[in-house]
């Protein structure tokens, strides 16, 4: 797969923006150049035991993080001795300063692309604790209003598409699908609009199309938009989308808690896959979805574990798309 020089430049600039967020977060800390802030007491609990550890997860209110909500509902974290609470965030990278300063310990539903690029820029030592979701054909795509005249992927050439973050999994997979369909991505313009604001922007004509995940894709379709293309097809079929991220410092200082969180979350994912009705029950509790919408929304796949192979697949696509990715991802996954 090849991408145009203009698109590579655009993605590279987006990567610099992520790095700027990270540099600002680090420089605003009282710590020196020793690295991200993460005190030994952050999150509570002794380093050798998980019992009594409090973990705050800055989590996106999307279907990606259903496994987290299921794990809380089914008591998997409590069984592991963890006290897990969730704070909703609109963008995963916006939660990075809180992560580095220790007010949250984990980012939930963070797209792999942004955090792999952060690691590659050596401004943030990333530790992936567990996977959140892999995309399926029906739960992630590009939508447009009927009046736009956009009905197929080829119609997106020269258009403006809203994404939650310009340097993330959305731009990468959308470009991959468009390229596979013979569309030049050089003229495609991406603008950052938080997921909750995408439908309003689309209806107001501020963008030609949106690249959205659930429940926001279903909200757009309910508002009259039409699905143009899934972004989980072709080169992006069953693509690993997002995961749960912490700092390597926190994971090293709290190894028992980190491992307990990983295992409880993986139980939550497995339970979510086996009991979709439970997922549909929890969705209205942390997303904007109604119970009626949750009953029919397409669900993704919640992987039981994050593998070097799946993370390497992302890194490979990143490099072919003009983004910077670590050459070795094996050390970034909590064993």
Positions of PLM-derived features:
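Bacterial N-terminal signal peptides that target proteins for export
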Residues: 1-16
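Solvent-exposed, polar/charged alpha-helical surfaces in well-ordered, non-transmembrane soluble domains
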Residues: 66, 70, 74-75, 94-97, ...
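Bacterial signal peptide processing site
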Residues: 27-30
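Secondary-structure end/capping motifs
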Residues: 252-323
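Conserved C-terminal helix/tail region of periplasmic/extracytoplasmic solute-binding proteins
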Residues: 318-335
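Pocket-lining segment of extracytoplasmic ligand-binding domains
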Residues: 111-113, 190-191, 196-282
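C-terminal motif of bacterial Sec signal peptides marking the signal peptidase cleavage site
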Residues: 20-25
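Short, glycine-/small- and polar/acidic-enriched structural segments
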Residues: 35-183, 192, 208, 227-230, ...
